Amino acid sequence: IHDLTLSVGLGTFRPIKTEKVKDHPMHAEEYFLDPTTKSVLRDPSRNRLAIGTTCVRTIEHYLATDDSDIKSPTRAEAQLFIRPPFSFLGVDHSLTNFHLPGSTLLCLVAAFLSPGKPNGLPMLKKIYTEAIAKDYRFFSYGDACLLRYAHN
């Protein structure tokens, strides 16, 4: 287990109101990574599990944008809107809640289910149909699901 510090903002829970999902203005969240965590994230032989979609976004932002010395800590802001088609750089698994419709968090899950392709929605609908049929609880304090990234 390795730590990252993330200042989650209210924007995480702001629903998408734009006509086109891609036009949604994404909020920024500050994060901090210590050198040990950076080293683990940069090691391609490691299997990485992110707890929560905000951690997924933080890790992916770090891997895509940070080229600082691995021996020094990183403080940055992630303003990354992950949606299909998105190819993940460093998260292999994600433990996350069942999110409400119209959220950026749900878009991230759809992208995780269809790496690099725009077709994560059918699989997402199948999973959520089963969750509704089995009375799973949704949103931040509800039930969770473990997602495995299907590397291409």
Q: Can you annotate each of these PLM segments?
A:
Residues I1-N152:
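Surface-exposed, charge/polar-rich loops and edge strands
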